[in-house]
Amino acid sequence: MKKQLLIAAVAATMGTAAIADVSITGNMKVNYTNTDANGATTDSVSHETNLAIVGKSGDTTVHMEMAMDDASDRFDNAEQTTVVLEDVHLTTTIGAVKVKTGTWNGSDTILAKDSDRTSGNWILSTDMQGVSIALEGDTQASATSTTFSGDIAGVAAKYKMKSTSDELYLSADVAGVAVTYAGISADAANSDAAAFTLSKEFNGVTVSYSDVDADSSYTVTGDTAAFGDAAALAMAAGDDASAIKLSTSMAGNTVSARFVSVDAAAANSDFDVNTFTVTRPLAGGTTLEVTYTDTDKTGSTNDKEVLDVELAVKF
């Protein structure tokens, strides 16, 4: 009997050791959306579920992310009840070189969305005298880029060289004001763009101002807190935009208001988008977020009001 107990204890210990470096996290959100477009009202309920599994062995990490969303967010209705494998990548070190390879989507900037997930990606990076150097490749898109980043006299700088364009990102604190700049210089004619954001807190209220300027052939598609999802705003080539955002905490709630004004390149196509959001953690472990968005376009037949109520949980 003692021998059996000893064997069971050893087996349990070995099993625990085998899975000690594996973690599972996830989140789910459910959204109720009411849309009023020129008097035509629609209601919908959608959900999004994500599950991430991370395994570690020494300096090597494997990340696998799965999702199951409803059909309203997918092109393929069959995915409504199918778990879809999304990000899968491995990170490790070989000497002084950090290696990341696999499938993932990039990071959005104020100018461009990089949410398309591609496979066969790889990044080789290392540090050299305070400067981070990264060589990145995308097998699916047949593209490579080189990025240099570091700190220059208190200014965080990143310069990215792509096959058909160069990108520059700067951020610094100037007299208590957070300043960021993003610029794209493209080989194609009339395809440059630049944006900046100024942000400062006044008596518990964070105030930010953002401005983006695009050449006649560049379409802003960024997705950041400054403007929200520019693609959802349906900005066209050559459209410029500015935004003011206010954010504060009030009675346990996070409250924000964002006012976006789009100066369209086409005549009589300007529009404003005003968004108000209240977020509150609930006792049951969920977070409730209510967002009201009012879009006022040139011409009374182009206006739209959207009320979105989201219930989300992370685990």
Predicted regions and their residues:
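Outer-membrane beta-barrel proteins
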Residues: 1-315
